[in-house]
Amino acid sequence: VHHLAGELFKITFQLDMVHVPYKGVGAVIPDLIGGHIPMTFSSMPPSMPYVKTGRLRALAVTSTRRSWAAPDVPTMIAAGVPGFVATNWFAYFVPAGTPGTIVGKLNAEINRTLKLEDVKATLVELGLDTLGTTPEELGKFVREESEKFEKLIKLAGVKGAY
């Protein structure tokens, strides 16, 4: 998502900037702090310790709402970039064909756990916002995200190799 957020930024502002395809945030953060690159899109967990100590400055979050971990940081939309949403998300998946009773029980337990105050506090400290959903809502979200990023990948001319 980080690379695609950068491509969306380039396209949105019609910028002529070089995309440096780092393989992970482990090398990006030191290069950003060291002034070797001017900016990056990063997930919250690896960045927040540096934001909290003043070594990095968070300009905006790319979600639709402010982060619980950084409530003073505006969304890209609030910062004046309409429609700019590119979130890094985590979900639980099971094999296709898993019985609905098992899916329902797992979903209920995951949602119950996400509501526990100590779990919420730990996740917020890491820079993660929680949102429990139903399997149907997750399926719809995954389809929408896939369609959105497929369009962006084509528009940006992104090529990949494995």
Language model: regions and residue ranges:
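Conserved, function-defining micro-sites of small-solute handling proteins
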Residues: 1-162
